[in-house]
Swiss-Prot record:
It is an enzyme of class 1 (oxidoreductase). It is a single-pass membrane protein. One of its GO terms (molecular function) is oxidoreductase activity, acting on paired donors, with incorporation or reduction of molecular oxygen. It is found in: Membrane. Its main location: membrane. PANTHER family: CYTOCHROME P450 513A1-RELATED, HEME-BINDING MONOOXYGENASE FAMILY. GO terms for cellular component: membrane. Its EC number is 1.14.-.-. This is Probable cytochrome P450 513E1. Belongs to the cytochrome P450 family.
Amino acid sequence: MNLYISILILIISLIIFFKNNNRISKINSKIPGPIRLPIFGNLLQINKDPHIQFQKWYEKYGVIYSIRLGNIETVVFTGYPIFKKAFIENSQIFAPRFQHLSRFEANGCKNLIGSNDEIHSTLKKLILTEITSNKIKKMENHIVLECENLCKQLDKHCQDGLPFSLNMYFKLFSLNIILRFLFGTINNSYQDKSNQDIVDVIIEFLHYGGNPIMSDFIPILKPFYKQNKFFKFYPILCDHLNKLIENYKNNKQLQKQQKQQQNEDDDDDDDGTIIGKLLKEYHNGKISWTSVVSTCVDVFLAGVDSTSNSTIFTLIALVNNSNCQEKLFNEIKNNLKKSDDGHDEIVIRHSLYRSSIPYLSLVMKEVYRLYSVILIGLPHITSEDVEIEGYKIAKGTQIIQNVFSTHLCEKTFPMSKSFIPERFIETGSNNMFGGGQTNLVHFGTGVRDCVGKSLADCEIFTVLATLINRYQFINPTLEPLNDIGSFGIAYQPPINNFIIKKRL
């Protein structure tokens, strides 16, 4: 009997599949792309490194091509000119997020990253008010303090001179900073086992969350979809953030009681935290509790992982290109101001030195290009029929941004696989290595770009300038450091060992 029921479900699913996709596939039929298999489409061609397969399709079919992932008709864009036409010039059509079943089951797509319409507008506006350039400058002391704490840890490795991995140090560094912005929490410990454990959960979640979940594309497989480890790690993250939120609320209540005991006015001023603003919107009935927790998860993940990954990839690149490391050190040294006691500053602030250390900005851009944290953008969906570059794209089509291939385009970035920071020197057409800031899409394009990009730039600039000025990073082996990361929602850097020598 179960066999007959399974066959009946399969037949019904196939009928629904062909009915729903007939219109989309007809409209999208002129877009080039690979041959699709029945039911699976091109899903089985995507392995553990989807960006590599997307690159192969791009090389064969061009900047716009069509694939089908299970029952979902998909169009892939490559290159900033196409991104601009879609996500800037036609932003209302391309802005909505495609909401897969797995994401909807996880948080109802009520988080900052996954939501659409009024929910997304409310959450984005709220987060942006807490990470403006002025607020980042006011909060810069948090980054300075964390840089000082990190240097204390790294100084110990200078003394023993042994090779060691930097990855966990930078994850914890970024974790401490984002906790300050999210909750106003100060945590200076790099030996806290619970923090290391949650970092491990973040890494695992971002790895498994980046790989296709089959039931998102073939609904008949829904009974098996929770076997994916995405559903193991996301609840752990939500529980962790829930505890942090409860700690914040308890601390606020304690502060309120203390003020009452001391007959002080409880004016409930804005404490400058993101969670404070989220809770205010929640109590005003503008967002749900799910939005509060899941948006905290979004900010927590991005704050811990994206900036630390870019920093690690930068140090790998600077060790493998030692001439770039020395060039950067010399520029920092030559432009550094003396403190009142005549010594060099320990922490090099973004607000003070951003314009006087231009080579660091070039290095950061080249890392954003060559080691983009996002290789394949989170999916969008078209809200109506549209035409891009002569191709008709139907309403309901999933849209994917091919960031990896965009940044490796030889036409835009000659010698694209080489680390050449000088390619971003703004010299117009005379720069033989291409460049131009607008061709970088690592922070996204249009209304869905990264809300934390200013904070990320500030944090990465400050820690890199500080560390390169203070230490020389050395490869302990004769072979170049491995710079091939692992695919996920965020591109994860490999584990390498470094030797560091103190310069100051």
